[in-house]
A protein has these predicted regions:
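Acidic, metal/ion-coordinating pockets
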Residues: 1-324
Length: 324
């Protein structure tokens, strides 16, 4: 709980306005998550985690954020595809249902509140995202967080611009919206440049893979890797073909259209520009030393005693997918 407090305090400082519950968060148990929800300065969202008996939502399904004169509905959804799902559902008497219908209910409720833009903040895999946005055309943007592949550009799925933060919390997915002429139809002005960059990267990787295959065939010690390298080469060529077709079909947007800008930023593990967060972490480590680091004598460090002088951290779950 002490580590959760550090996260909560840091997120409050960052001005976080919504947080979607992920499958690993559920592993903390409902009692802990309810405690976190009470102490957090932002809502914990999930439209599709429900009580098994009543079918009622366990957490809030959406929140309305006001920005630049617009009402933006941010809807949370949690993946229903994870290893210990049955165990979690039994222990807390909950169900994690498919997100399509639960998201539709949140859209209806948000519309009644005057929402104009709809964002899905999804702890979902790509197949779940695709099913959800295709069955809910009102969704215009998806910020995802359980991608297997790293995105190089925003993709249009149905009516929604979809981006992902890849996995393991190592990247921050940042999407900015620019409204022009009061239009809420958005284009990606950087699509052509991003496709060209992706095309060149794939061409370079294909050449490198072909050299690796040729080298492996000549080396008896590496012959066993040839089949794997060849499969990977086929995959790269398929991706290149898809990108080339996207480039051929791309229509450059009008200059006065509303547009998006998206960036995937690697997380900085240092604290040089976040002194207040560093102070919280230092206070936490004074009580709970990092178990992955051992002193020179090889012995694991003992937890320090908690004193009245030690700053008391607040509370929060592991980082998820923030909305900006």
């Amino acid at each position: 709980m002490s580590a959760i407090g550090v996260y909560l305090a840091a997120y409050k400082q960052m001005g976080l306005q919504a947080y979607t519950i992920g499958d690993r968060d559920l592993g903390l148990g409902l009692k802990t998550l309810r405690s976190v929800a009470r102490k957090a300065s932002f809502p914990l969202l999930s439209s599709n985690v429900v009580h098994k008996d009543s079918g009622a939502k366990v957490f809030k399904g959406h929140t309305i954020i006001r920005k630049a004169g617009f009402k933006i509905a941010v809807i949370g959804a949690t993946t229903s595809l994870f290893v210990n799902r049955n165990q979690l559902e039994e222990s807390d008497n909950i169900r994690v249902i498919a997100p399509e219908e639960s998201v539709a209910k949140e859209i209806k409720a948000a519309k009644a509140k005057g929402a104009q833009l709809f964002v899905l903040l999804g702890h979902l895999n790509e197949s779940e995202v695709e099913r959800t946005v295709r069955s809910n055309p009102e969704i215009q943007f998806v910020l995802g967080g359980q991608w297997v592949k790293m995105d190089s550009r925003a993709k249009k799925v149905g009516n929604a611009w979809v981006v992902g933060a890849y996995m393991r919390g190592k990247n921050l997915s940042v999407m900015d919206l620019y409204v022009q002429n009061k239009s809420l139809e958005f284009v990606d002005r950087n699509a052509r440049q991003q496709l060209i960059r992706q095309q060149r990267t794939l061409e370079s990787r294909i050449k490198g893979r072909e050299r690796s295959i040729e080298s492996a065939r000549k080396d008896p010690k590496r012959k066993s890797s040839v089949e794997y390298l060849e499969r990977n080469l086929v995959q790269l060529k398929t991706e290149l073909q898809e990108v080339s077709l996207d480039l051929e079909d791309l229509v450059d947007p009008a200059s006065d259209a509303s547009y998006i800008k998206w960036d995937l930023r690697g997380m900085d593990t240092g604290f040089s520009d976040e002194k207040r967060v560093a102070k919280l972490v230092t206070a936490h480590r004074a009580i709970y030393p990092d178990p992955t680091k051992k002193p020179r004598n090889g012995k694991a460090p003992k937890p320090a005693l908690k004193t009245s002088r030690t700053p008391k951290p607040t509370v929060r779950p592991k980082p998820g997918t923030p909305v900006r």
